Amino acid sequence: MSEKPKVYQGVRVKITVKELLQQRRAHQAASGGTRSGGSSVHLSDPVAPSSAGLYFEPEPISSTPNYLQRGEFSSCVSCEENSSCLDQIFDSYLQTEMHPEPLLNSTQSAPHHFPDSFQATPFCFNQSLIPGSPSNSSILSGSLDYSYSPVQLPSYAPENYNSPASLDTRTCGYPPEDHSYQHLSSHAQYSCFSSATTSICYCASCEAEDLDALQAAEYFYPSTDCVDFAPSAAATSDFYKRETNCDICYS
């Protein structure tokens, strides 16, 4: 007891754990209440000191857990004391098993009438699909016929429909072959005639006029119904334009 309390650097401890244990043991010895055996557990290891310096006494640990102790179930009536408890539970369990059986029998007996009413619908469905099918009840009372019978659909071709081969090619926007040869021959005649009378001009204005004349000749055909334009008038106008342009270039 003559030892001075150790003072660590930076921390001042009023009382150590060892001194707390000594004081606790001295207090227990003075009161005469030292608990024996495994009923109480004394902490021999040092416990970390708290800031308030309090010491907590551990609770005694019993060998049997609390939820298995008999004292808590003193108010309950055990099955050993009351022998009729098991009989009542067993009877109630048998009653719950016996009641669903009539329900199961009723549910099992109901589908026996269901297939008879269900078989009539496929035959009506087949009768509505197949025209002229017999309505004899003796034939329909047999087993179900699952054979596939394709329904003959009526032809939906309209009366005013014409085949693509009978279309008039002259009304289409594509040029026929005969007209292209005629235009080429006409342009060849014009070029030969102009070369015999006057020399050919290769200036930019004349070439542009020639291209315009060729494009106009490609879009206007003599046998089309959509354009009311005479090809002879177009050819003569193009011819006079080229003649005047050539004269302007050489003048």
UniProtKB/Swiss-Prot annotation:
A Gene Ontology cellular-component term: nucleus
Superkingdom as given in the UniProt entry: Eukaryota
OCA domain residues: 5-27
Annotated keywords: Activator, Cytoplasm, Nucleus, Transcription, Transcription regulation
Annotated signal sequence range: none
Tissue expression pattern: Expressed in many cell types of epithelial, mesenchymal and hematopoietic origins. Expressed in tufs cells.
Region entry Disordered, spans: 24-45
Domain notes: In the N-terminus possesses a conserved OCA domain for bivalent binding to class II POU domain-containing transcription factors and to an octamer DNA motif (5'-ATGAAAT-3').
Protein name: POU class 2 homeobox associating factor 3
Source organism of this protein record: Homo sapiens (Human)
